[in-house]
């Protein structure tokens, strides 16, 4: 089977990590609260460099994000992006169902989905995973990447 798990080991890690449950919740939360509060996703709003320098940085993460980072740190670097992609896909399906029930498909759905991937793309960086900085999810990224 194709999909994000061309590396069988990563599929196993994804299952062991309970499909990155905290990351899924985090992605879902970020995508749904569009435009409110700090988004933790976009480079310009969140200066990673300061965070690296500043030992207090990581403590300011919301607990859910911290849990998600812990999940990612347990993955092998090789599997971080594939497992995140798996998590993003799962969230995308949840969102599609949720918005479908509310009759909100179309542009709004696209917007939310692009936020899921945008958030996921930067998670390794937000979580200070040394070997991975940004996951190359190109497919659903609108505009120039």
Curated annotation (Swiss-Prot):
Changing residue 100 to E: In 1.0101, 1.0103/SA2S2, 1.0104/SIN1, 1.0105/SIN2 and 1.0107/SIN4. The keyword Cell cycle does not apply. Residues 40-54 form a propeptide. Coiled coil: none annotated. Changing residue 138 to Q: In 1.0104/SIN1. Keywords: Allergen, Disulfide bond, Seed storage protein, Storage protein. This is Allergen Sin a 1.
């Amino acid at each position: 089977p194709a999909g994000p798990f061309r590396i069988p080991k990563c599929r196993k890690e994804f299952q062991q990590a309970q499909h990155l449950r905290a990351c899924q919740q985090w992605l879902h939360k970020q995508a749904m609260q569009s435009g409110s509060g700090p988004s933790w996703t976009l480079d310009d709003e969140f200066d990673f460099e300061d965070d690296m320098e500043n030992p207090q940085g990581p403590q300011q993460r919301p607990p859910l994000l911290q849990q998600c980072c812990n999940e990612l740190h347990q993955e092998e670097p090789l599997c971080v992006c594939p497992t995140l992609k798996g998590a993003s896909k799962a969230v995308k399906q949840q969102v599609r169902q949720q918005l479908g029930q509310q009759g909100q498909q179309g542009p709004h759905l696209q917007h939310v989905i692009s936020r899921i991937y945008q958030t996921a793309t930067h998670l390794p960086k937000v979580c200070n995973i040394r070997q991975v900085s940004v996951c190359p999810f190109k497919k659903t990224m609108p505009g120039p990447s």
